C-alpha cells in the first residue's frame, strides 16, 4: 500500500476509533500521538515480516547486537523521516485539527539508556537497517528508565521516568516467544555413557517476555527489530499466603521478578544492588541467546552451523555472560562436547570495549555467581582453567597469568572473559584502540594480535543533521546538489569549495542565529531561563564524571568572572555557558559538581556586572530530545576530558557536523578530528595521553597551586563559597590532597592555564565572523567520516563478515 496524507489520515482516525473509542475531535494529544505511532508501527511491522522472510529464505548471516542501553530518544519523527512520510504526517495531523509540533512534543524519550553507550547503539541500529544488514538489537525493557532529573535548590533529585505510559505505543509484546530464566538452586552432575549429564533443580523461575520495537532504515524497505525483555514471575501470586491475609508476602515473588526490568543501573554500593545488577545482566543474555538459538534450530535443525549464521556483538562488558550461557546451551541442552561448543562461541561472539577506566571494567564477586548462577559458575571455572593454561603455555610467567586470569582473588573479571571468549575485540577510536593494544590488554594482544581491531564510533547523521537542523540540511542540499549526503555522507566534502564564499558564510551564520533563537525559546518554555542569544553558546553536555572534567570548565568560568570583577571594562564577547549532565545516583562527587555548577550560575547570573556579558545555565534532565534542540544552536563544543580517558565520544561528532567548533584535548575521537581539521580549525590544549601517563608518577598539584596565583584564587573560591552560602571544601580537598585517592586524579590543575588560553583564543576568533564561519563550514565538510554508516560498514567488513548495501 502507498501512503500519503489522505491514507495516513484514514489510518489515524481508524486507530483512534478502534483503540481509544473516540473521534479525532474527542482525542487528546496523547491519544493522537499514540495513534500516529501505531500507524507507523503497522507499516514497519508489515515490512519487517517481509525482511525476515527474505533473510530466512536466503539463509543470510544475522547480526545480534546486545547492549544494556539503547538511548532511542523519540521515535515518531525519526520513523516518519526514515519512511519518507514526515511531510505527509505533518499535514495529516494538522488537517485532523492538531498541531504537528505539539504531537511530536508529546512523545517521551524512551527510557532505555543513559549516555553515549546507549546513543551509539541506537545510531548503529539505524545504520544496520539502512545498510540492509539482517540484524536485531537486544536489551531490557526498563519500565522506569534511568531517572528523570530534577534540580531542587541546586542539587540533583532523581525521579522515576514513567516513559512507557505513552512510549509503549511502539512496542509489540510477543507473549508466545517468552523465555524462562533460572536463578539459584543446586546443580547435580553424573556421567551417562561417556556424556556429562547436568541436573539443575530448586531454582527460581523468571519469565522473559519480549516486546519488539521495529526499526526502519532510510531509503529502504528493510526493517530490523529491537527486542526488549520484560521480567515477569510465572506465578503472579501465592494464593495460599494471600488467603491467610499475608498480602505482601503473597506478591513477593512477583515483585522480585518485576524489579529486574524496572530501572537501568540500580545503585550497586550494597550487596542487594550488586545482586540485582548481576540478575539483570544474566536475565538479559539468557533470554536473548535462548531466543536466538531457538530460532536458529527452527530454521536449520542443528546448532553445528550456529557460528556461520550468527554474530553476537556485545556492546561493553554488560552482556559478557552470553559467553558462558551459550556454552551452557550448547553443552547441556544440545549435548555438544566442550571443544566443539567453544569453537562455536569463539567464532561468533565479538566484543566492543568502551572504557579504559578500571572501575568500569566489571569485576563481580565470585560468591554472587555461586549463589545466583550455580551452573554458569561451573562453566566459568572451566573456561577460566583452560584460558589460564593457554596463558601459562604462552608466557610461562605467573605475573601475566594473574593479570589475564578470568577468576582471581574472589572476583570474576568480565573484560578478561570477553577477551578469552571472543573472535574480535575492538576499541572505538584510533587512540583508544592503541591504548588497548599497548597498555590495557597488552599481554592478551601479544598472544592473539589479530583479534584486536579498531572501529571508530559514528553517529546517525540523518538524525543529527537532516532531521534536527532543517536550515543546515537545506543549505547542504543546495550546495551539494541534492540529498545524496543522506546515504553517502562523504559528499559533505563538496562544501569545502564554499569556504571562501561570503554569501554562503552569511547564510550559515543566519542559520546558526535562527537555531540559537529556537533553543532560547525552548529553554524559556522548559526551564524559565532567558538566554542571551547575542552571546557565544559555549556548551558542555555529557554524563557527569570527573574524567570528563566539568570541574575544569567551572574553574575557567570562575577565573573569567574574577577578571570581570577586577576590570569591569574588560573587552570580551558575551558568553553563555550551557551545561547538561546526569550524575549516577550513588556518585557523590559528581552530584556535588552539579551543585557547584548551580551555585556558580546563581552567583554569576545575579551579578549586575555580568548582565549580557556572562551567563551560566545548567539544563535540567539532559536527554536526546533536549540535545536535538541544543546541538544545532551550539557554537562551541567542550570536549575536555583528561587525555587517554575518553574512549571515543560521539557528542564531539554531533557538534562538529552541526558546525560548532571544538575546544578540546587530544583524547578519544578528538585525535581523528584533529587529523582531519588541523590546529587551524579547532582549539586544542592540554597534556597528551602519553604525557598524562608520564606525569602521573611525579604529579604534584600543590606545587601548581602555590606557583600560580590566578589558579590559586579560582580554586580557593571553592572553599570560600558562593552567594547561596554553599562551600565546596570537599572538592578543594580532592584537587589538592590525597585523603581520598590521588590528589587531582584527572589533572584539572595541570591543564588549567592551557585551557584558559584555548578559551581566550576561541573568543578572539569568534569576533572575526568570516573566519569563524569558514572554520564552521570546514568542520561540517570534513565530518562525513564520522557517520555511523561508515562504522557499520567497517564492522561488516572486518568483524561480522556480512554483505551490506553500498
Sequence positions of predicted segments:
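A conserved ligand/cofactor-binding region detector
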Residues: 1-806
Amino acid at each position: 500500500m502507498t501512503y500519503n496524507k489522505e491514507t495516513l489520515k484514514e489510518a489515524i482516525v481508524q486507530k483512534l476509533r478502534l483503540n481509544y473509542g473516540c473521534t479525532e475531535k474527542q482525542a487528546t494529544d496523547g491519544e493522537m500521538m499514540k495513534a500516529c505511532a501505531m500507524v507507523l508501527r503497522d507499516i514497519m511491522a508489515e515490512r519487517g515480516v517481509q525482511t525476515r522472510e527474505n533473510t530466512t529464505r536466503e539463509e543470510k548471516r544475522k547480526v545480534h547486537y546486545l547492549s544494556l542501553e539503547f538511548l532511542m530518544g523519540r521515535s515518531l519523527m525519526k520513523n516518519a523521516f526514515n519512511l519518507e512520510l514526515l511531510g505527509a504526517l505533518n499535514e495529516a495531523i494538522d488537517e485532523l485539527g492538531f498541531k504537528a509540533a505539539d504531537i511530536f512534543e508529546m512523545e517521551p524519550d524512551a527510557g532505555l539508556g543513559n549516555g553515549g553507550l546507549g546513543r551509539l547503539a541506537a545510531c548503529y541500529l539505524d545504520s544496520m537497517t539502512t545498510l540492509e544488514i539482517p540484524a536485531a538489537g537486544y536489551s531490557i525493557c526498563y519500565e522506569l528508565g534511568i531517572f528523570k532529573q530534577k534540580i531542587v535548590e541546586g542539587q540533583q533529585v532523581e525521579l522515576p521516568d514513567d516513559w512507557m505510559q505513552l512510549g509503549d505505543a511502539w512496542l509489540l509484546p510477543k507473549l508466545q516467544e517468552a523465555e524462562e530464566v533460572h536463578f539459584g538452586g543446586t546443580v547435580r552432575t553424573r556421567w551417562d555413557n561417556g556424556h556429562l549429564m547436568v541436573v539443575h533443580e530448586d531454582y527460581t523461575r523468571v519469565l522473559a517476555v519480549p516486546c519488539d520495537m521495529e526499526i526502519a532504515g532510510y531509503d529502504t524497505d528493510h526493517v530490523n527489530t529491537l527486542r526488549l525483555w520484560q521480567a515477569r514471575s510465572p506465578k503472579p501470586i501465592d494464593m495460599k499466603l494471600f488467603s491467610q491475609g499475608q498480602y505482601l508476602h503473597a506478591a513477593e515473588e512477583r515483585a522480585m521478578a518485576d524489579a529486574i526490568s524496572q530501572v537501568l543501573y540500580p545503585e550497586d554500593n550494597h550487596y542487594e544492588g550488586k545482586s540485582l545488577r548481576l540478575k539483570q545482566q544474566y536475565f538479559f543474555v539468557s533470554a536473548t541467546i535462548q531466543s536466538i538459538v531457538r530460532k536458529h534450530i527452527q530454521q536449520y535443525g542443528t546448532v553445528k552451523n550456529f557460528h556461520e549464521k550468527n554474530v553476537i556483538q556485545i556492546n561493553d562488558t554488560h552482556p559478557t555472560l552470553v559467553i558462558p550461557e551459550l556454552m551452557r546451551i550448547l553443552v547441556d541442552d544440545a549435548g555438544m562436547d566442550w571443544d566443539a561448543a567453544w569453537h562455536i562461541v569463539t567464532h561468533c561472539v565479538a566484543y566492543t570495549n568502551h572504557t579504559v577506566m578500571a572501575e568500569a571494567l566489571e569485576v563481580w564477586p565470585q560468591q554472587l555467581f555461586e549463589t545466583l548462577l550455580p551452573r554458569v559458575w561451573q562453566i566459568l571455572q572451566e573456561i577460566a582453567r583452560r584460558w589460564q593454561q593457554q596463558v601459562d603455555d604462552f608466557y610461562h610467567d605467573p605475573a601475566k597469568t594473574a593479570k589475564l586470569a578470568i577468576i582471581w582473588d574472589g572476583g570474576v573479571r568480565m573484560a578478561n572473559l570477553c577477551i578469552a571468549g571472543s573472535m574480535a575485540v575492538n576499541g572505538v577510536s584510533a587512540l583508544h584502540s592503541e591504548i588497548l593494544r599497548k597498555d590495557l590488554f597488552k599481554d592478551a594482544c601479544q598472544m592473539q594480535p589479530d583479534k584486536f581491531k579498531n572501529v571508530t564510533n559514528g553517529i546517525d547523521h540523518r538524525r543529527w543533521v537532516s532531521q534536527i537542523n532543517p536550515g543546515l540540511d537545506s543549505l547542504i542540499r543546495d550546495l551539494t546538489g541534492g540529498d545524496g549526503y543522506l546515504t553517502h555522507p562523504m559528499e559533505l566534502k563538496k562544501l569545502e569549495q564554499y569556504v571562501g564564499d561570503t554569501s554562503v558564510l552569511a547564510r550559515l551564520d543566519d542559520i546558526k542565529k535562527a537555531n540559537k533563537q529556537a533553543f532560547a525559546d525552548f529553554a524559556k518554555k522548559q526551564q524559565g531561563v532567558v538566554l542571551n542569544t547575542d552571546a557565544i553558546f559555549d556548551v558542555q553536555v555529557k554524563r557527569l564524571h570527573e574524567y570528563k572534567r566539568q570541574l575544569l570548565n567551572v574553574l575557567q568560568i570562575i577565573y573569567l568572572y574574577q577578571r570581570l570583577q577586577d576590570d569591569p571594562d574588560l573587552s570580551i564577547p558575551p558568553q553563555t555557558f550551557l551545561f547538561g549532565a546526569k550524575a549516577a545516583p550513588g556518585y557523590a562527587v559528581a552530584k556535588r559538581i552539579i551543585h557547584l555548577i548551580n551555585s556558580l550560575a546563581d552567583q554569576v547570573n545575579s551579578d549586575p556586572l555580568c548582565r549580557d556579558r556572562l551567563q551560566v545555565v545548567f539544563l535540567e534532565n539532559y536527554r536526546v530530545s533536549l540535545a536535538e534542540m541544543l546541538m544545532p544552536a551550539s557554537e562551541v563544543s567542550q570536549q575536555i576530558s583528561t587525555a587517554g580517558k575518553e574512549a571515543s565520544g560521539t557528542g564531539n561528532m554531533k557538534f562538529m557536523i552541526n558546525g560548532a567548533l571544538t575546544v578540546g584535548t587530544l583524547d578519544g575521537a578528538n585525535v581523528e578530528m584533529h587529523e582531519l581539521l588541523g590546529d587551524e580549525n579547532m582549539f586544542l590544549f592540554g597534556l597528551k595521553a602519553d604525557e598524562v601517563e608520564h606525569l602521573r608518577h611525579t604529579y604534584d598539584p600543590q606545587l601548581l597551586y602555590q606557583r600560580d596565583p590566578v589558579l590559586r584564587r579560582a580554586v580557593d573560591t571553592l572553599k570560600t563559597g558562593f552567594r547561596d552560602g554553599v562551600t565546596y571544601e570537599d572538592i578543594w580537598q580532592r584537587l589538592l590532597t590525597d585523603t581520598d585517592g590521588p590528589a587531582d586524579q584527572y589533572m584539572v590543575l595541570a591543564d588549567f592555564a592551557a585551557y584558559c588560553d584555548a578559551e581566550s583564543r576561541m573568543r578572539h576568533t569568534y569576533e572575526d565572523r568570516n573566519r569563524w564561519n569558514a572554520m564552521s563550514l570546514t568542520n561540517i565538510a570534513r565530518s562525513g567520516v564520522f557517520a555511523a554508516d561508515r562504522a557499520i560498514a567497517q564492522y561488516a567488513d572486518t568483524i561480522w563478515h556480512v554483505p551490506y548495501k553500498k
